[in-house]
């Protein structure tokens, strides 16, 4: 809304929010079921619903003719999907055929690169050592449930094995 972009259509899709109404630019928009999504006639589709949704629907959106921006981790290691941080390599967007998919890097990576790029432009950084600590919630609802179970439920539950080792009280 703040950018006042020329938006003819805005479709909202979800799973747990189906039927919810969102106000945008003076319009009331209802969240529709993503399983029934039709991406035809959409120029851009932004996915910010996790890797499972991205794996199911991003390629469908591209085949329907849309340019897809995926915010999940699903395509981050796919060499055919460019990672784009507009302030860093946004100029590469002009070289990407549409319809297509672009992805964004991990949030820690994006923030770090925003700081390092101007320094690199001045004096060519050759190496950086970084340690980050990511939230369990970034892995999804099943991971947060596993963490909860490991902390509060002492017996009678079965681990989902989202992580290779116990996540509660641990750094992995």
Task: Tell where the protein language model's regions lie, with residue ranges.
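N-terminal Rossmann-like NAD(P) cofactor-binding subdomain of oxidoreductases
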Residues: 1-167
